[in-house]
Regions:
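Phosphate/pyrophosphate-binding loop motifs in nucleotide- or prenyl diphosphate-using proteins
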Residues: 1-178
């Protein structure tokens, strides 16, 4: 069976309930941004596995868990009857944030994204999460409410993971100066 269906050639796509919808609809933009984030996280995971100086297998696992969550969020957004344990996932992220926070030097200034390429890509992923969060709010839908705390914490987690990669690789954080 070919990957192409030709159904989208006229600017429409189908939701999981087979409802046809414009490809420029806010919900399709939201799901497209989730896909973009998922691909960026794939770049981050691949990059983490290429680092020889340190073992980042735990970070790869964290990233892949997030990728799985994003598929669920996107599926639910377009009508799939899946469950997402938002409170549990937020709690898991908060625990991971706390773990990284204990390992890192206290931050006293804003930092510019950069350092190691993997850290820079984690920062890029963080900005994609913020975009998705704004899109979820703009959808103004009850179905988005459980995802908002998850997305909010997720950007914090990716920020700390970027800092952690730089810290472990002894890359200097670039302090923002006015």
């Amino acid at each position: 069976m070919p990957i192409y269906t030709k159904e989208g050639d006229k600017g429409y796509t189908s939701l999981s309930n087979n409802q046809k919808i414009n490809k420029d609809s806010p919900i399709i933009n939201f799901v497209g941004s989730l896909d973009e984030l998922n691909a960026m996280l794939g770049v981050c995971a691949a990059s983490l596995t290429e680092i020889d100086e340190e073992d980042f297998s735990t970070e790869v696992e964290v990233v892949q868990d997030i990728q799985r969550d994003l598929f669920i969020v996107g599926s639910i957004a377009v009508g799939a009857k899946l469950k997402f344990a938002a409170e549990k996932e937020v709690s898991n992220i908060e625990k991971t944030i706390d773990d990284y926070s204990r390992l890192l030097p206290k931050l006293k200034n804003f930092v510019l994204p950069g350092g190691d390429i993997t850290a820079a890509n984690l920062h890029l992923a963080r900005t994609l999460v913020r975009k998705i969060e704004r899109q979820a709010v703009a959808l103004n839908s009850k179905s988005m409410e459980p995802f908002l705390p998850y997305l909010n914490r997720l950007s914090d987690l990716l920020f700390l993971m970027a800092r952690y990669v730089n810290y472990k690789l002894k890359k200097q954080e670039i302090i923002w100066k006015t």
